[in-house]
Amino acid sequence: MIVFYRPDRDCVIRANRLARAWPCVVVDNTECVATSEQLGLDPQITYLANGANLGIATALNQGINCLKEAGCTCALLFDQDSEPSSQLLAELPAVLSVERVRNDRVALIGPAYEDLRLGGVAPFVRFGYLKLKRVQPTGQQPVEVDFLITSGSCLNLATWAAIGPMDESLFIDFVDLEWCVRARSKGYVVLGVPALRLSHELGGEPVQVFGRRYPGHSPVRHYYLFRNAVALIRRGYVPLSWKSTELVKMPIRLAIYGLFMRPRLAHLRMSLLGIWHGFIGRAGAL
């Protein structure tokens, strides 16, 4: 399935390509409703137009439930800007099938993602106190990780009811991390597949600070990032290791967004508002 938000022609082309490989659902969070024919989508695609931005979590839940009702056993999840290769489309569900035989508690698997703007292939991640542990994507065997980004991941639908849906109160940021953390807290497994790659752009245009490139976002996205980080820090099932790392990173992020991203005041204001709303329990759309 793919989540649309104000898609361009390339997004439609990517969706049509996916539909040639697997049953495909497109959930569109664009404010203006269009038909699948107007967009140029393949007739085989199930198209759900929300007519409003209901958030990534709601859109994912809609698409995943649609695939489950259609009798699918797994769900490949993509952002509209992701470029999955034919190899990934064929092999990721096959890897999940093999891993399910070995362990029926495998909930999610995913490739290493590659963003050339941020320096190439990103490592997989395990939580550590004060600092994330980075696992380089090498070798052929899947490796256990603490979370995966949504795009490019393949979800075992047999685990969906037990783990539960994506948390719609988060709206957008940390939705993937929260679901993985919840799955692992219930004894399920998340696996990275180092042999597979996904071309994916994380965030907007990066900003370079002291030689390191950070993904750029709008001030509103930074609101959600800080609000949801605080919200997750307050939840008991979220590991202390992740909380400690996030508390270290939060002031650094705040400084980067407030000093190096324009308009500086808007980024700083929305980030601080997010922190405040996280403390008072504000959830959902801004």
Locate the predicted segments by residue:
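Short, well-formed alpha-helical segments that are part of the catalytic scaffolds
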Residues: 1-20
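A conserved acidic beta->alpha catalytic loop
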Residues: 27-37, 52, 82-83
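Glycine-rich, basic loop-to-helix element that forms the pyrophosphate-binding segment
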Residues: 50-67
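Short beta-strand-to-loop acidic/aromatic patch adjacent to the donor-nucleotide binding site
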Residues: 72-83
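Conserved donor NDP-sugar-binding/catalytic core segment of glycosyltransferases
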Residues: 87-123
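Short, flexible, basic/aromatic active-site loop/helix in glycosyltransferases
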Residues: 125-146
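A short, conserved alpha-helix in the catalytic core of glycosyltransferases
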Residues: 153, 159-164, 169-196
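Non-catalytic, C-terminal membrane-associated alpha-helical segments of glycosyltransferases
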Residues: 235-286
